[in-house]
């Protein structure tokens, strides 16, 4: 089955400009929002501007919800659940878009700062599935928070402004890399060697005796800078969450500017149109939901991951504010729901054709991707979407002229992966993975097609309105 290139729907002129305009809005978003906290904060800000009320405030007011009401629940500043209350009884199920807003990266350890041969470094622990060798010799930035004992929080964002310093992980020069070049790719760069070089000037002292007795003078100088500029000391790293991410803005990619290269397309290229689709929903038939979660890259665990009870609890609170609470009603609302697990898919790469089966893989320019199943080694660990549900989605997308394609994650036994789909499916929901195709997935700089992003937006809007 030959799928038409989605660009052909948008000839030069206003329609094509709409594609580029939405892509530019997204490019700016991922250029500034590089952590789950930053994404959640920006989405929350936009939601409030769009008339979404905070769920906790509605609970405190013992408010009564009605069709058309817009609600946002905030999960520790690392995830959100947005609801637009529908005309129909919520027991009939919700239309849910579920994406994650964390991305592969490196995190600073809790005791990160040390000195070696008069060079100051920060020790890191990588997060998610990464090719460690891809993270060396790159300009890197620090994003995150430092929470102090007095209750104040210092926001960290260093390396993005032109005048900011950047940081990096060094690599061995080719002239001395004979042994290194013989290693497997997984061992070329060891995880414990992903340490950031952050300084080399010793702390100043007018006392020569003090200079000789002072240990780790370069480290001391870095601590002086941190104290002067941020008001933090070394122990404050114990209660910090600082993420190491590629420095710099996302960029248009290609002579025709048809693509975007940026950090964190997985999964913000699905989270952004999911959120944008929610803003277009006013008074749906079924309650519409946009779920933006953390920790997907490490198994969706923890209080901010999909495996927590945050979403289920939020649904229970919504039903209570509708004046109809019962445990059975919560269970029915979840069981009867329909979900697009908005996560990325691997795009066919002409440089590496052998890992894909060409009839069942995703291509740039062919629109929104549906993955009936993911998993590995005989679909192990996958959510396998029902044929009846896929047929319904085909009709919706065709009725709304949404370009879409179907895909698997590589050839049989080639590898595999997973998403949050199976977790939501545990409630008995109809769930399928549906997102944007990505090149260089999990690399510091990933690539997507602008037209696929635009088709995702329209597909998500159609789903919320019609599913």
Residue ranges and their predicted role:
Residues 1-467:
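N-terminal hydrophobic/helix-forming segments and targeting peptides
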